[in-house]
Amino acid sequence: MPFMNFRNFNFMPLLRPLNPVYKGAEHLCRKNIHNQVYNVETGKTIQILQDLVPLVLYRALPDAILDHHVELVIFPNSLNFPRIEGLTIYKFIFKTARLLLSSTYGSSAKRPIDIIHQLHSSMENKNVRYSMKCNWIASPNDEYTWVFHFDIDKKGIIYRHIIDNLERNRSRQCEKISALKPDPIE
C-alpha cells in the first residue's frame, strides 16, 4: 500500500456536507463570526418567543427582549389604528387585553395559544422578521386565529410587533374581523 501524503489531500469536500453554509475560506473571516453571534442572539429571542407566546394571554413577554421604544401595529391591512410606541403602553395594551379576555371568557382565557405555523425571514440591515400563525380556542364554539409578526434586530431585541389577520370561528362559521365591533344585541 503506498504511503498517503496528507499535505496534498484536499479535506474541503469532506467538510461541505457537514456545514451547509461553507463557502470556501470565508468561514474564518471576522464578518462571518459576527453573523454567528448575531444568529445566536436572534435565535435566543426566537426560542423565548416560541416558549412564551402560547402563554401571552396570562403572562407578559419579558422586558429583556423588548426595545424601550417597541412599536405595536394592530391590523395594518384592514384598519387604520394608530401605531403604538413605547414599552409601558405596549405592556399596558396586553394587560388590558388579558383583563378583557378573562372577564369575557373566564377561566378559558388561561388556555394556551397554539402556534400553527412559524416562519422567519431576513430583512434589511441584518434584521429578522419572525412570523407565527396562532390559534386560540376560547370556548367550545368560539375560536380565534391571527398572525403575529415580530421584527427583531441584530442584538435579539424586538423593535416592532404586528398583529394581523384576526379571524373568529364561531360555531363552525369563519369570519374575518375587519373591525372590532360588538356582537348584535339579540
From Swiss-Prot:
GO biological process terms on file: meiotic cell cycle
Signal peptide region: none
One Pfam family, short name: MMU163
Keywords assigned: Meiosis, Mitochondrion
Localization terms from the record: Mitochondrion
GO CC terms, sorted: mitochondrion
Record's keyword annotation contains Mitochondrion: yes
Function summary: Has a role in meiosis.
Name of this protein: Meiotically up-regulated gene 163 protein
Source organism: Schizosaccharomyces pombe (strain 972 / ATCC 24843) (Fission yeast)
